[in-house]
Amino acid sequence: MESFGVLSMKKLVAYITAALPDKEFTIDLALALSASGVDSLELGVPFSDPVADGPIIEHANLLALQKGFSLQDLYEITEKISPSIDTLWMGYLNPFHKVGFEQTCQKAKSLGVSGLIIPDVPFEESAPFEEQCLQNNLALIRFIAPTLGTSRIATIAPMARKFIYLVAYAGITGSGREEPLSPLIEEIRAINPEIPLYLGFGVNEHNAKEKSKEVDGVIVGSALVKVLLDERLTNTQKMTTICALAKSIKESINS
C-alpha cells in the first residue's frame, strides 16, 4: 500500500454517489475529476439510512436506490476507474454485511480499492473489520472528532492507515457547526506525526482554503453532490460544474 508522509502539496478527496444518475456518468465523472486535480475518490455506496450524512447526500443515496443501484454497479464502476484514480469505498455496514465483510474486502482488493470508510462501525467493534482490511491490503479509514477524549485519540491515532478523517464537528456532513480544531490537530500530530490529516464535513469552495490551513488535505462531498442533484442542469453541465469546483478547491488549498 502507498505510504504517505507529511504532505507538502495538500490533497483533495472528492465524494460522489455511485451510479447517480447512472454507472456510465459516474465513470466519466470520476475520470474527469482525476484530470481536474482530485487525488482520491470516495465512491459512495447508496444506502437507505446513511446516518452520518446530511440531507444532500441522503437524498442522493435514495435517488440512486430508486434507480435500481446494486453492488454490481459499484464493482463495475470501480473496475473502470481505479487504474486512473485512488479509489475508496464509503459505505455503511449493512450492504457490506449482506455480501459478507470478508468477501467485500476480497472484492475491493481485486478491483483496486485502496481503503474503506465505514462511518457506522464503532471503534470498539472495529477489530475484526480492521483484520480483514489488513489481510487484503486495504486501509480502514479512522475518524477522529473534537468530542473524542484523549485516551481514545491515543488509541486510534497510532493505528490509523492512509489518512485520518478529521471530523470538523460532531454532527452530519454538510452542516456548518464547527469546533476549534487546533488543539486536536496538535494532539494527533504528537502521537502520530506521519499520518496525513484530512478534514471533512462542511468543506466547500468558499471555506476550503481556510479549513485546510493546519491539515494535509480536505474531503469535499455535499458541495459536489448538490450539483449532481440539480435538475436544471444536463449531465454534461453537471460534470463541467463539478470538475470546475474541484479544480478551484484544489488550487485554493494550495495557494
Swiss-Prot record:
SUPFAM superfamilies referenced in this protein's UniProt entry, alphabetically? Ribulose-phoshate binding barrel (SSF51366)
Tell me yes or no: is Amino-acid biosynthesis among this UniProt entry's keywords. yes
Q: Could you name the Gene Ontology cellular component terms for this entry?
A: cytosol
UniProt entry keywords in alphabetical sequence: Amino-acid biosynthesis, Aromatic amino acid biosynthesis, Lyase, Tryptophan biosynthesis
A Pfam family annotated for this chain is Trp_syntA
What is this protein for, i.e. what is its function? The alpha subunit is responsible for the aldol cleavage of indoleglycerol phosphate to indole and glyceraldehyde 3-phosphate.
Q: What is this protein called?
A: Tryptophan synthase alpha chain
- Species of origin reads Wolinella succinogenes (strain ATCC 29543 / DSM 1740 / CCUG 13145 / JCM 31913 / LMG 7466 / NCTC 11488 / FDC 602W) (Vibrio succinogenes)
Per the record, the gene is trpA
